[in-house]
Amino acid sequence: MNVVQGNIESKNAKVAIVVSRFNSFVVESLLEGAVDTLKRFGQVADDNITVVRVPGAVELPLAARRVAASGKFDGIIALGAVIRGGTPHFDFVAGECNKGLAQIALEFDLPVSFGVLTTDTIEQAIERSGTKAGNKGGEAALGLLEMVNVLQELEQQL
């Protein structure tokens, strides 16, 4: 039986992190978690990490698409926080962001890791950005590192 799986060390990986500025009090912690994970676990060099800032979660897919189209990166991490309010706006923003990022991964055959929090409350967002529920930015980075390596393994074996 042949099993293809990736590890998380990826010293030469070039990673773009597309970050929403909206809800920055949460998103900055996600960014710190992602960068720390890339460096400590993935051994990714500072020079191989590019941060792209956009206004909000709706803008993440367009910026991520431009990054993917450049052909200069092995993967993209999208970070943001969409917190439910009193209107259906939350559903539209969260859904379109998720759909757009998934399309980019398939269109460009490139790992795009979804580190966009979609929570009902500010407290839930804070918990997922480095307190009780861990740091979802760091988790998104781990997933990205593994997928970069899985795709490289598949390329070599297929």
From Swiss-Prot:
The active site is at residue 89. One of its GO terms (biological process) is riboflavin biosynthetic process. InterPro entries: LS, LS/RS, LS/RS_sf. It is an enzyme of class 2 (transferase). (2S)-2-hydroxy-3-oxobutyl phosphate binds at residues 86-87, 128. Pathway: Cofactor biosynthesis; riboflavin biosynthesis; riboflavin from 2-hydroxy-3-oxobutyl phosphate and 5-amino-6-(D-ribitylamino)uracil: step 1/2. GO terms for cellular component: cytosol; riboflavin synthase complex. It catalyses: (2S)-2-hydroxy-3-oxobutyl phosphate + 5-amino-6-(D-ribitylamino)uracil = 6,7-dimethyl-8-(1-D-ribityl)lumazine + phosphate + 2 H2O + H(+). 5-amino-6-(D-ribitylamino)uracil binds at residues 22, 57-59, 81-83, 114. Keywords: Riboflavin biosynthesis, Transferase. Its EC number is 2.5.1.78. Pfam families: DMRL_synthase. GO terms for molecular function: 6,7-dimethyl-8-ribityllumazine synthase activity. SUPFAM superfamilies: Lumazine synthase. Catalyzes the formation of 6,7-dimethyl-8-ribityllumazine by condensation of 5-amino-6-(D-ribitylamino)uracil with 3,4-dihydroxy-2-butanone 4-phosphate. This is the penultimate step in the biosynthesis of riboflavin. PANTHER family: 6,7-DIMETHYL-8-RIBITYLLUMAZINE SYNTHASE (PTHR21058:SF0), 6,7-DIMETHYL-8-RIBITYLLUMAZINE SYNTHASE DMRL SYNTHASE LUMAZINE SYNTHASE (PTHR21058). NCBIfam families: lumazine-synth, PRK00061.1-4. Forms an icosahedral capsid composed of 60 subunits, arranged as a dodecamer of pentamers. Belongs to the DMRL synthase family. This is 6,7-dimethyl-8-ribityllumazine synthase. It comes from Shewanella loihica (strain ATCC BAA-1088 / PV-4). The gene is ribH.
